[in-house]
Amino acid sequence: GIILELADSIQENLGTDGLYIDQIAAAAPYPCYAHNHPHPAGGGEFWYHAYRDMMLDLRRDHLKDGNVVFSEENAECYIPVFDILLTVNTPHSPSCRIVPLYPLIYSDRTLTCAYTYTPYTDVTKGDFRHENMQCLLYGSQLGWVDPRLLWVNDESAYEAKFLKNLTEFRKKQHDVFIGGRYVREFVPEGDNPYVNVPVFGGDYMVKGSEWISPDGRRVLYVVNSDSKAHKVTLPTGKKITMQPISAKRIDL
């Protein structure tokens, strides 16, 4: 099929380390009433079965060793056939609170990238830093951003530095984020400013999450998205100082 031919061509001719296949984990399984199709009229499960069979074929006979394949969004039924899911469909507004239900349930079964759309025109208003802080705490891959918005000026270069800090920190957390379980989010007490984040509403500059590694170790992650240092208190009672635009791991 066309998808399998493209998979071969992209890996062979472009030398990529993986494949991104749009829409599969995002497309709704609309009912089909075609009389010549071998399923009950109005059935929709054929979408899943057909995509699953195609992806199993791709992984078995077309995906190069060591390469990954990921798709758009995060329909649960496709977790077994993709390595990474691009989760950018999280709705948010100042009038609602995001509940990290997906990582709570599936963090030990799949890897995610991002969790909502990145700013389209300006990364210096606060929402970009807030999003990347949340991404790290959820265990998601970072970097879902238009690079043309970074390094435009000193302000945007600072945002790029924050992203780089978190990215370099995250690459050392594979022992937890790969196969580990996201347990909860928490807000450290103490010197922790509460601010208005554009398109998100009020939230804290320093936030944290608790994980359990695949071998059962409890780990806390804390991120300071502010340009100032803050001394905060963890749920364990321990006091720590978070440097500007930084992340920290605490093994319990």
Name every feature range the model reports, one short phrase each.
Residues L4-A7, W47-M242, S246:
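Active-site-proximal substrate-binding groove within the catalytic cores of carbohydrate-active enzymes
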Residues L19-Y20, Y30-P31, H230-T233:
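Extended hydrophobic-aromatic, low-complexity segments
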Residues G1, A27-R52:
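Aromatic- and acidic-residue-enriched carbohydrate-binding clefts of CAZyme catalytic domains
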Residues G1-Q23:
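An active-site-proximal structural segment forming one wall of the substrate-binding cleft
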Residues I21-P29, S71:
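Conserved beta-strand positions
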